[in-house]
Structure formats: C-alpha cells, structure tokens
C-alpha cells in the first residue's frame, strides 16, 4: 500500500525526466505519486518526512521485458548442470540424481553448457537412458533452446518426430535413430510437460510458493515489472491469481499450450488470460538460439575456419573445429548462411500474425540472427499491428539490416548482458567487422526505440549489470566488444526503464511530477559495479 505521507528524498543524485538526465537534488512523493522534483538547495519545507540520502542515487524503477520468470522459479528448486565439464560429468550427475529420487519424479537439470567442455560432445540417447534407469530425465542448456531427454521423458511429452512442425528439432543419426538432442519445439514440449507435472504434484500452495519466492528475488534485484516472453493459458491463470499477493508487476505474452516455440493459434487466443499491467501480446519464434537464421560474407567464414583451426592446434584438441561445424552452413546468394528460419514461407507468418493483430494483440518476435530480423521487419511492415511490436535479440545485424528494421517502428529488445559470455563466440565466427553485434548505438542512430532486457535465466538477470555492459561493452578479459556500439549511461538507463515499458506496450516517462512513485535507491553511481540497490519502491510503497 502506498505511503500517504509527504516524503521528500533530498541530498541525492536524481536520474529524472524523459530523456533521462542527472541532477543534484531530490524529489517529493505523496499518495503513490511523484509530487515534484527539485535541485539541491530548493528542498520543499511542507513535508511530513525528509530523508537525507547522503549522495545516493535515485533511478526510475527497473524493468525486465524478457525474463523467463516461471521457468526460473522452477529451476531454483532443481539441479544445476553449469559445473559439468564433460559428458562423463553429465552422465554421473544424472545417474546419482536418479538414484536419490522416487521413480515417478522428474529429474531436471538446467544451465548445461557443453561448448565449454574440453570435448564438446553431448551424451547420446542410449547413454542418457542407461544413466536414467527408466526415469524421466530432462536436461536444458543455458539457452532454453536445446536439451537432452531420456526416452521416458520423450514418451511422457508425447514426442513424435514426424508430428513436429520442424522434424529436425529431434536430432537423428544417419541411420535414422534418435540421437537424444532436442531443439526448439521438441525441447519446449518436454519442458512444459515437466513443468506441469512438477507443480501439479505439489498442489496449489507449492505453486504459490515458488512464484512468490521468485517475485521476492526480483524485487531484491530492483525489478518493479517483469514480462515473461511466453506462457500457456494454465500458467497465465496461475500468475493472474497470484498477482494480488506480490507488489511485483507481472505480465506475459501468449504461447501455445504445448510449448513456447510453436506459433500460437485461435485456441490459444480463446483461452488466454491477460495481465492487468500490460497490453495483451503474442510471441512468434522466427529462429532459434544456436540454430539461428543468419548470413555473413564468405570472408567471415574463412576467418572463422582459420581461427578454429589455429585454436584446435594450440589447445591440442578438436573442440573449436567441432563447435564450428556443429551447425549446418550453406552457401546461398554468395553468403555463408545458417538455414534455420522457423517460417520458410513468410506468408504463413503474415497470416498468423495478422490474426492476432486484428484481435488487438501486440506482436512480439524472437529473431536472433540477421536473416530472421529482416523477415520480422518484412512481416511487420506488411501486417502493421495496431498494438505495436517488439523484436527480441537481433544479436548480429548489418547496417543494411538496421535500415530495413528502422522502417517498422518496432522496439528492439537487446541483451547486452550476454556480451561477457558470447563475445568470444561472436569473434570466433568472424562476424566483426561485417556485422554489428548487440548494435545498440546503430539502432539508436536510426531512430529505433531500444529496450535492454535479460533473457534470464539464459543470461544475467541483474538489470544494472545488463545496463552497465551496454555502456562499457566489457568482455571477460576486460577488453571491449565493438566499442562503436557503446551507449551513454543515460541512454542505457532509459532502455532498462522506459525502454522496457515501451517493449511491453506501456508508457513510462520516468521520474517526473505526476508519475507513479516507482523508483530505486542505489548506494552509488548505478554504472559502477560496486554499487547496489538498497531500496525498491513501487507506486509509493517500499517493497524492498
């Protein structure tokens, strides 16, 4: 509940207005609203309470317009695969977890990253089944786009390769036997099946507990509004029912009932339950994560091959070369292309998007590679959704791609928090200087509204960490990834506050008179890694 008293926060550094700017001073709040902002020396005298912040910073309430909130909530209660360093580690961990769990329970691991293994080779289905001993086992990697599953888990999810929209989402050997690696739709079906089985087994109180625990963690991280990029109707209903029990504002995009990656349809619209905190939206996936739809000059591919060869020689292992050729690469129109578009026919995409646009939905699109981003732009220019649109990721774009996208009016939701983890992979691809990675500055220059989001738990879910990486572009070794794409602290803070609202289809003008008193107090400059959020306020109430 909002504090009804007049409270003046003084002796602060205030990041206020739109566009955001800094000033020494503070602000006065009352009844859940900002009454005034003031410079140092002009503090109001007619207040019930005055809080001296001693030079701390006040920033607008932080948002995350792309955070897998419900999956993250479940992951906190299950096994962590991030420490695995080999296939044997994976199989040993699966075997041990299966020994210690009742036979009917799921065994779930997340955050696997086999690209960091000395020998980046995943277990086969036969090996997973041997370790699982007849149990339902599911392992998701860091992207939530690829995973491993036992035969029992696949059977429980009703997986059938030929019934998938993209049969290639279940890998096979040359002889047609299943390899055990699942992608996109197949991965999503097992994930949603497991999620329902797990939370239903524990009942309503457990469902509330895991959601409220995750909401509390978000508030502690200074988040005031979180948007889940895709939920089915039963989980939408769950969040809608729990919303009154947390001050964290929750919203979501509509997905199919079966999984996140298949295009939603008429039935998903009919059964949808929408948030009170954002316009209704629907999610379409145009490519994957590792399996992205992208192209680059042949010269970039040659650079990548040379580097992979040299790395393999210097490290005395085949890992770098194995990872390079893990994906299908074809020569098309004089460019090296990763041919992983989910919609081979753009007219099918236009038809599906038009249905939801005519129903008043905001269109949200996953497009990680530049080919997918251009397809998204062409679809949006044709459909022109009245509810607006957001396109997420756009990890690598050419200048020409950015020009095409700028004509759509859509928000670009980018995740610079991935820079420390993925900069090396981008450079190993030979993408620079032919493509712009995380092209925040280039998008801004072309007038594209930008949002900074996390894609948590796939990337860092700390909103200030993500904003900082947009400013400094730091890799793990301290050097910068394409420094020309740096943006200013004010631009970054705007992207993780007002930009987040724009991506969700809402409006936030920042800390200005008349606006909701939703803000965070930071111990120091928010762009110093040593600074931390010490208070979070939503609509005039301190929630952390």
Indicate residue ranges for each PLM-predicted region.
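Divalent metal-binding segments
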Residues: 4-10, 15, 19-30, 34-249, ...
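His/Asp/Glu-enriched, well-ordered alpha-helical/loop segment
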Residues: 354-364, 371-389, 393-394, 399-407, ...
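Acidic (Asp/Glu)-rich catalytic clusters
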Residues: 242-245, 268-277, 358, 405-409
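Glycine-rich tight-turn/loop motif centered on a GG-T
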Residues: 298-311, 332-345, 385-390, 425-436
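Structural recognition of the beta-strand scaffold that forms the well-ordered cores
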Residues: 106-108, 138-139, 251-254, 390, ...
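Short, flexible, mixed-charge acidic loops at enzyme active sites
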Residues: 293-301, 307, 466-473
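Histidine- and aromatic-rich ligand-binding microenvironments
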Residues: 1, 14-17, 22-23, 51-52, ...
